[in-house]
Structure formats: structure tokens, C-alpha cells
């Protein structure tokens, strides 16, 4: 088996684009319905009240209000608190 493939070949050339994951709206920030709160792989954060989860585990606001981070049963959850509360 040759370990050198020959002229005009390279084993380099792979540098994938960043996935731009992470928290997009932080605690206390006001969001509208449909705004993305967190882009994630897997459920690092779980959806709470007023928050939906997309097919790629993205969390988004279902109702307008302020973002609130908390825990429930040892899991990190994100809730939307209505402006009047």
C-alpha cells in the first residue's frame, strides 16, 4: 500500500463552516413569538412555558414576553414570562 499517492493529490482541504450554535436571546430579554432563543445540538436546554422545540432541537418563543432561564427536575429549562407578570 502506497503511503504517498502521487502528484497533484492532497489529504488536506477540509475546514467546515461553523454551525453558529448557542444562546441567541439571554435572560430578561424581550422576545416576540417565533424568535429563536437557542440553537443547539441535542437538548442542553429544554423548552418550558411558552417555548417550542424545532426538529433540530432549536428553542423558539411561542408567545411574546421576557426570556427566563431556570431549572426543573435537574434540567435547564427556558420559559417565556408574559410582560404583565
UniProtKB/Swiss-Prot annotation:
Q: Which GO terms describe its cellular component?
A: cytosolic large ribosomal subunit
Q: Is this entry keyworded Hydrolase?
A: no
Q: Where is this region: Disordered?
A: 1-20
This protein's source sits in the domain of life called Bacteria
For this protein, the record's InterPro entries field holds: Ribosomal_bL27, Ribosomal_bL27_CS
Family assignment from sequence similarity: Belongs to the bacterial ribosomal protein bL27 family.
Query: Per its record, how is this protein called by name?
Result: Large ribosomal subunit protein bL27
Amino acid at each position: 500500500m502506497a503511503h504517498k499517492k502521487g502528484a497533484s493529490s492532497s489529504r488536506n482541504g477540509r475546514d467546515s463552516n461553523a454551525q453558529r450554535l448557542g444562546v441567541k436571546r439571554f435572560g430578561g430579554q424581550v422576545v416576540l413569538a417565533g424568535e429563536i432563543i437557542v440553537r443547539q445540538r441535542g437538548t442542553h436546554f429544554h423548552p418550558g412555558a411558552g417555548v417550542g422545540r424545532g426538529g433540530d432541537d432549536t428553542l423558539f418563543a411561542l408567545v411574546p414576553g421576557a426570556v427566563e432561564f431556570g431549572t426543573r427536575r435537574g434540567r435547564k429549562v427556558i420559559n417565556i414570562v408574559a410582560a404583565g407578570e
